[in-house]
Amino acid sequence: EIGFLPENPYFYKHLTGAETLKFYGKLCGIRGKKLKARVAELLEIVGLEDAAKRRLDGYSKGMLQRIGLAQSLVQNPRLVILDEPTAGVDPVGSREIRDLILRLKEEGYTVFLCSHLLEQVQEVCDRVGIIFEGRMRREGKLEELIKIEKQTAMTLENASPELLAKIEGLVASEEGAAIVETGHPRTTLERLFIQIAERRSKEKASAEKKEEAL
């Protein structure tokens, strides 16, 4: 029911990519043709078909992370837990892993992602929890967390300078201009995390001053 990719997975480097997946498949009770088909499917999903017969000691960091992601899916789990899946991976490899996570979402997997790379989290997650000093500080839908309250953004299409000069409240269509989008402008998860951390630091400093005053 659960697949897991730790931050620093350990693999037997003398095994090939295909042999590694077969090994974990057998640990999960998969055998025969079903296992062979599943290994081929996973290698295709993570883009390692051409490296299937290559030993892991010849894999790059990004390739090792992808084979790790494949092993977490070997038993077709309902929940996949990924702990820092792009740790030590170059930007290209990181983007490939991000795309893999998005593909898993599209295929119906539930992915629990733990990462310090908040930009990456913002790209792939629907719901987010922010932990600071060992406690959950904020949790909820991504769009709700990062929107900036009491501000409204408006995007216009084909708006003339004259129309822009007249905008004060309600925007009316003129010469083909149309309201494309209205809503709250967005912050980023990184800025939100920093705000939470700074707020927490101020609260601690205030509490310490009160204790000193007693």
Where are these predicted regions, by residue range?
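Short phosphate-engaging motifs
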Residues: Q120, R137, E162-L163, L189
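ABC transporter nucleotide-binding domains
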Residues: E1-L113, L118-F132, M136-R138
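ATPase nucleotide-binding modules
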Residues: T155-I167
